Design a protein with these regions (language model features):
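Conserved Rossmann-like nucleotide-cofactor binding loop
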Residues: 14, 37, 157
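C-terminal helical "tail/cap" subdomain of flavin- and related membrane-associated enzymes
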Residues: 310-437
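Glycine-rich FAD pyrophosphate-binding loop
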Residues: 23-43
């Protein structure tokens, strides 16, 4: 029988983050995942400032991720065709990046191994039950496992929820549905810039192109399930989107798919979902921890993983009620507030006028562009004004993540510092900031 202080089920960002934090605090941690890494994961591959800061704190180095691409500017097109450039801050460090999950998650799991986590990838958990002051698991190819706590990072349809009998909404399908396809020979504006298109028929959803090294890009779109758009029509809608001139011109005439399109559901309901079942804490997609407005979830996954670890550390092995209380309070008190604000803003973006007004206001001048892009990329929490306990001194003007790594190279260009080509410079004319398409 395998014994541990904590067993983590799931090797994605939330599970690995929890495992790393626990191992560094001296806990004996085992991690199981049914997949063998590296493995692909359907995702937009974008990394917000908040996610980058957490990855840095947990020990992930960008140069360990082969497909890492620093982003220095974002372009947003409103339903009216107004396109605004939002340059990311030049205060040092990285504020946004793109990395394929097949590379990112494998590299992060290596960080967990280096921290002392015993990783069993390719081994599925087949049963789970709480027994007195332990949680008992049965794992394929490993056998029985017992731990004081379990961190469930096993995805939106968490099998552990079902095994423990705490499925709180049968038939749940998520708030978002997204489709992603990798493109190669991207030689247009999308080769270096990150693009978001708020086309009227997608609202409050959007289409995107996120740059990757070597003339490649993650291109896709996401829709809200509540918007009355049937998900079975997404592949046909995708073919139509790719023919739209304002998207085709950004990708470049030679851009072509290098892999099939893949679709996936996205959960975004952390404020109301069940976060704890006895000695089991749910994190990441299993906690439905995704931004309600954008569908982004990597930063939220890392945050829930760390919060779960800190709760276990603070509560100790014999006070599961305190662990549960601390974890729920921290999640609901911070991320719950972000979720409620994002849901409110999403209602504004459902309508063409609302989306058009949002882009107009955000791009009004240098000050609005500078502060909007920080907020958009989660340099600080969505609802930070309503949660003073999350304020920090340099919140509105501090540097990005990985500043020390950039300094060590002796260059101020983020992409070049990490071995990637720098983003193409934009002309210093009004058209570089705003242009109709």
């Amino acid at each position: 029988m395998l014994r541990a202080d904590v067993a983590v089920v799931g090797g994605g960002p939330s599970g690995a983050a929890a495992a790393i934090a626990l191992a560094r605090a001296g806990r004996d941690v085992v991690l199981f995942d049914k997949a063998r890494f590296p493995r692909d994961k359907c995702c937009g591959d974008g990394l917000t400032t908040g996610a980058l800061r957490r990855y840095q704190r947990l020990g992930l180095r960008p140069d360990a991720v082969a497909s890492w691409q620093t982003v220095t500017e974002t372009w947003i097109r409103s339903p009216s065709g107004r396109t605004v450039r939002f340059p990311l801050p030049d205060t040092g460090g990285q504020f946004a990046a793109v990395a394929r999950r097949v590379d990112l998650d494998a590299a992060f799991l290596d960080v967990a191994r280096a921290a002392g986590v015993k990783v069993y990838d390719g081994h599925a958990v087949t049963s789970a039950a709480e027994r007195h002051d332990l949680v008992a698991l049965e794992v394929d190819g490993v056998g029985p496992v017992v731990a004081r706590y379990v961190v469930a990072a096993d995805g939106m349809w968490s099998p552990l929820r079902k095994k423990l009998g705490v499925t709180d909404e049968p038939g749940y399908l998520g708030e978002w549905h997204a489709l992603r396809q990798y493109f190669t020979h991207v030689d247009g504006a999308a080769a270096h810039g990150l693009w978001v298109w708020f086309d009227a028929d997608l609202l409050p959803g959007y289409a995107w192109s996120f740059p990757l090294p070597g003339g490649r890009a993650n291109v896709g779109f996401g829709i809200h399930r509540s918007a009355g758009k049937p998900t079975h029509e997404m592949k046909g809608q995708w073919a139509d989107l790719l023919q739209r001139p304002h998207i085709r011109s950004v990708l470049g005439a030679d851009a072509r798919p290098e892999s099939p399109a893949k679709a996936w559901p996205i959960p975004a309901r952390i404020a109301t979902t069940c976060l704890v079942a006895g000695r089991v804490l749910f994190v990441g997609d299993a906690a439905r921890a995704t931004d309600t407005m954008t569908g982004e979830g990597i930063g939220q996954a890392l945050e829930t993983g760390e919060l779960a670890a800190h709760a276990v550390i603070a509560g100790g092995p014999h006070r599961p009620a305190l662990v549960a209380q601390r974890y729920q309070r921290q999640v609901v008190g911070g991320m719950g507030a972000d979720d409620r604000l994002a849901a409110l803003l999403s209602r504004t973006l459902r309508h063409r006028k609302g989306a058009r007004a949002a882009v107009l206001v955000a791009g009004a001048n240098d000050w609005t562009r500078r502060n909007f892009v920080r907020w958009m990329w989660e340099d600080y929490p969505r609802a930070v004004l309503a949660t003073p306990h999350r304020w920090r001194r340099d919140m509105l003007h501090g540097p990005g993540a990985y500043r020390d790594e950039l300094r060590a190279t002796g260059t101020a260009t983020p992409g070049a510092a990490l071995g990637h080509p720098p983003a193409a410079s934009s002309p210093a004319s009004p058209l570089a900031e705003e242009r109709p398409t």
